[in-house]
Swiss-Prot record:
<dbReference type="GO" id="GO:0005576">
    <property type="term" value="C:extracellular region"/>
</dbReference>
<keyword id="KW-1015">Disulfide bond</keyword>
<feature type="modified residue" description="Glutamine amide">
    <location>
        <position position="34"/>
    </location>
</feature>
<feature type="disulfide bond">
    <location>
        <begin position="8"/>
        <end position="19"/>
    </location>
</feature>
<keyword id="KW-0964">Secreted</keyword>
<protein>
    <recommendedName>
        <fullName>Turripeptide Pal9a</fullName>
    </recommendedName>
</protein>
<feature type="disulfide bond">
    <location>
        <begin position="3"/>
        <end position="17"/>
    </location>
</feature>
<keyword id="KW-0027">Amidation</keyword>
<feature type="disulfide bond">
    <location>
        <begin position="13"/>
        <end position="30"/>
    </location>
</feature>
<dbReference type="GO" id="GO:0090729">
    <property type="term" value="F:toxin activity"/>
</dbReference>
<keyword id="KW-0800">Toxin</keyword>
Length: 34
């Protein structure tokens, strides 16, 4: 998805994606819920 992996320091992602903590990258990133 277009927003997968986006940084979201403000907690906001583009449409359809959710901001959550990425353990591997140790930062908040956007992901598209499966």
């Amino acid at each position: 998805n277009v927003c997968d992996g986006d940084a979201c320091p403000d907690g906001v992602c583009r449409s359809g994606c959710t901001c959550d903590f990425n353990v591997a990258q140790r930062k908040d990133t956007c992901f598209y819920p499966q």
